[in-house]
C-alpha cells in the first residue's frame, strides 16, 4: 500500500483504483492507493442486508428483494452522474464496476435462495424446540402440584399416638422440611408467572424467543428504510453496519465463550468462568440447606443411639431361673422325662406372656425383636435335647458293653472242651454202667445231653463203617484182577495190550500167551476195556456180593457230609446254652 502526503479537501467521491495523472482535475490532491476490489460497495451492502434477513419473515423477504433491486438501479444512476463530472479515466472505472455488479447478480440470487432455505429450517427447528420446552414446563408444573397435594395430605393426616413411632414422626418432619420450599414458590400469585429461572445467562427462555424475533424483524425494516434514504442522498450507507455491530455484541459474547471453552477442552465438563461461579453459588445454597437440616436433626435425633435391644423384665428373669431349677431336678430324677418337660413348661409360661404382649402397644421394632428371641429359644431348646439324648446313649452303651473277639474265642474253646469231656463220660457210663457218679462239671440240660449222646453214637457208627469199607475195597481189587486174568486166558493178546494191562492193574502174563498179531490186538483191547455183552464170570455168586458192598460204600460217602453239618449245628447250640446260666 502506497501513501502520498497531501491535502484531501477537494475529494468528494469514493476512492478509485487509479493512480494520479498530471492532466486530471484532482492532480493537486493526494490519494491512497489500495488493491483492486471490484464491487466492494455492493458486497458490503449485500452482507449487511443478508445478516438482517436471518431474523425476518417471508413477507419481509419479498419486500427486501424489491428494495434491493431499486437500490441497485439508483446506485448505477448515481455512479453514472459522478462519472460525468469526473475525468475520462473515471468513466472507464465506473463502467467496469457496473459490468462486474451486473455479472454478480445471479450469484447473489443463488446465495439469497440458500439463505432463505436455511432460515426456514432454523425456524422449523425453533418451533419444535419451543414445543418441547413447553411440554417439559407443563410436566414440571404437574410434578409440583402433586408434591403440594401430598404435602397437604401429610399435614392434614392425624395419626393415632398408639401406633405411630418416633421414626415415622422424624421421617415426616424431614419430608415436610424438604417440600416446604417448593410449596412456597408455587402459589396462586405465581401460577401465571414463569416459575423456572435460567441457570446460566446464555439461556434464552422459550416465551421470550418469539418476542425477540418480532423485535428483530421490526428493527430490520427500519434499517432498510434508512439505508434507502442514505443511498438516495449520496451519503455513506455504513450506519446499518454500525447498528448491526451493536446488536451483534451478543454474538461476540458467544465467540468469547467458545474461546474460553476451547481452553478447557481437556476437562471432562467444559465450563466458562461465569458458569463456574454460578455453580459455586448454587452449591453454596445447597450446603447451607444441608447444614441447617443437620443442625435441626442433631437436636431431635438423640434417640438414635445404639442400645442392647430387647431386655427382659425382672419377673421374667425369675421365671426363667425357676424353670432351670426344675429342669435340673427332673433331669437328675429321670432323664427320659426331662427331654419333654421343658417344652410343656415353656408353653404354659408363654401363654400369659403373649396375652400380656397383645394388650401392649405394638411398635415396628418390637416385632423383629420378638421373632429373634423366639428363634433363639427354639435353638437353645433343641441343643439341650440333643445333649440329653447323647448322654442317654452313652449310658446305655456303658451298661451293655460288647465283648471283644478274643473273649468270644476263649468262651468257644471252653465250651468245646466241656463237650469233649461230656462225650468221654457218656461213653464210660455205657461201658461200665455206673449209676452214681458225681458230676465234675456244671449240670447240663436234658436236651443237650441227649444231643451229645446221639453225636457220640453217630461217630462210633462212622468209624465202624469206615473199617468195613476198607476191607471191602481190598477184596474188590483182588477179585477184579482175578476175573480179568480169567477172562483173558483163552484169548490171544498183543504186546501193546499186555503192557497196558501190566501198567494199569499191575498184572503179569506169560510170554507164551503173547502173540504178535494185529487183528487179535484190536479184539483183545475191546475185551480188556469190558465192552462185551455179558461174560461168563458175571454168573459167579461172589460177584454180586462185591457189587452190593460197593453200592453201600457210595451211600455212606454221600451221607457223611450231611452228618458233619448236623454235628456243627449241635456244637453251636450247646455253646449258647452254656452261656445262659
Swiss-Prot record:
Keywords: Coiled coil, Phosphoprotein. The modification Phosphoserine is found at residue 87. Residues 52-77, 344-360, 569-581 have a biased composition (Basic and acidic residues). Residues 14-30 have a biased composition (Polar residues). InterPro entries: Fsip1 (IPR026246). Residues 105-153 form a coiled coil. Residues 1-77, 338-365, 555-581 are annotated as: Disordered. It holds the Pfam family FSIP1. Belongs to the FSIP1 family. PANTHER family: FIBROUS SHEATH INTERACTING PROTEIN 1, FIBROUS SHEATH-INTERACTING PROTEIN 1. This is Fibrous sheath-interacting protein 1. It comes from Homo sapiens. The gene is FSIP1.
